[in-house]
A protein has these predicted regions:
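Long, hydrophobic N-terminal alpha-helical segment
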Residues: 1-56
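Glycine-rich, aromatic-bearing surface loops/beta-hairpins
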Residues: 93, 101-163
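Short low-complexity, flexible loop/linker segments enriched in glycine and/or proline
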Residues: 45-48, 71-72, 157-159
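Short coil/turn connectors at secondary-structure junctions
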Residues: 1-3, 25-28, 52-53, 73-76, ...
């Protein structure tokens, strides 16, 4: 298995990602996909320092080019994007299939135009559309900051966005 865990988290790599989730879903490394972070040496260095594991920070296009190598690897990776829109690009538009069909949504901070779903979990209409598209592609979506702290799945919240 090349990907052991799929997560959307606006902080991408931090203590919650690397410690409690790694106990639930063992991993050897992390793949963070975000165009802005991948183009910033400072952000890349910060994410790599925070993980304590082999860490890659790629653009969405980089991931597309390297997806088969990820699938062929014996290394178990967490696949993390900063937002649902990037995850939709990978799972739906690129059609990346790794055998994992559950997407965990972690912290998504309050922003202008976002709807609060729970503590530190808010999404915009555009992000909701991305989650709906991911769901329709056959993925279950759970909102969970930590393994033992879940506020529910996408079906519980999608009505707030007209789905």
């Amino acid at each position: 298995m090349s990907v052991s865990f799929i997560r959307i988290d606006d902080r991408m790599i931090h203590g919650q990602t690397c410690t409690p989730w790694a106990r639930e879903y063992p991993c050897d490394g992390l793949i963070a996909v975000n165009d802005k972070a991948a183009k910033s040496d400072v952000l890349k260095a910060a994410y790599k320092a925070a993980s304590g594991k082999k860490t890659f920070v790629w653009t969405v296009e980089d991931f597309k080019k390297k997806a088969q190598k990820v699938l062929d690897s014996d290394t178990r990776y967490f696949l993390i994007t900063k937002d649902p829109i990037d995850m939709r690009k990978i799972l739906v538009e690129q059609g990346f299939k790794c055998g994992i069909t559950k997407v965990i949504v972690g912290p998504c901070n309050d922003r202008e135009g976002s709807t609060t779903l729970g503590n530190n979990q808010s999404i915009t209409q555009e992000e909701a559309q991305a989650l709906e598209d991911i769901s329709k592609a056959g993925y279950s979506i759970e909102f969970s900051l930590l393994p033992d702290v879940s506020i529910g799945n996408w079906d519980k919240f999608k009505g707030k966005f007209g789905f």
